[in-house]
Amino acid sequence: MLDRYQAVDPAKLNLKPGARILDVGCGTGRHLLELSRYPVNLVGVDMSREDLRKTWYMFLLTANEQPVNATLELIVGGGEGLPFPDGAFDRVMCTETLEHVPDDGAVLRELLRVLKPDGILVISVPDEYSERLLWRFSERYYNTPGGHVRIYRRKQIRRLLRDNGAEPFAVEYKQSLESVRWLAHSTIDKEWGQPGRITRSLRWLLDTPSHRNWRVLAWLDALGNRALPKSIVLYGRKVRPAAR
């Protein structure tokens, strides 16, 4: 099944009932909503009040349509100076966020500070190959306010996790069809943020819920992920401090 929105694989999180899960830069709550079917405690942090309002609305809507077993708390804020004590969470997620912030190291240290020892951290950032193409084809892609401020090399993002106390144990490459959509927008559309006919068609193809079960789309996405994924997703386990 194709799901262009879900970077995180719940199976790799090994969720236990009552686990506390933090999503920093949660946006409109795509991963929080996916995890709401589990009996866990979810916390979302984002700078945008509007996005958090949309998250809460979608959470209530989801609860009316299917079983929701999670609790949800939403907090306005950024990744630096998180308002939680050390080791407050069993799992921490931060997807498509680090590439936007000036001091990614400070944010990553905060993510690991609030994560319990042996807890799992999930990070996703744009993959270097698709990102380099987008930067080359369109200056608008990286010059838009609030846009991406860096390109991560694959080895670099792994090293960033290790240097800050998390040992990667799994990596996935995802959402190659999103690379196609962004390339179309960057090279064909005249107005940035105003998708043209081709880009609108691609968005319709990828966004329509009934299309998620189209095997051909899932096959094309999986094939494309070998060459031009949009995102790299890393799972790391927080290293326990050495015993003294």
PLM regions: where:
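A short glycine-rich, Lys/Arg-flanked "PGG" loop and its adjoining helix->strand segment in the class I
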Residues: 105-120
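Alpha/beta-hydrolase-fold catalytic nucleophile elbow
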Residues: 124-126, 174
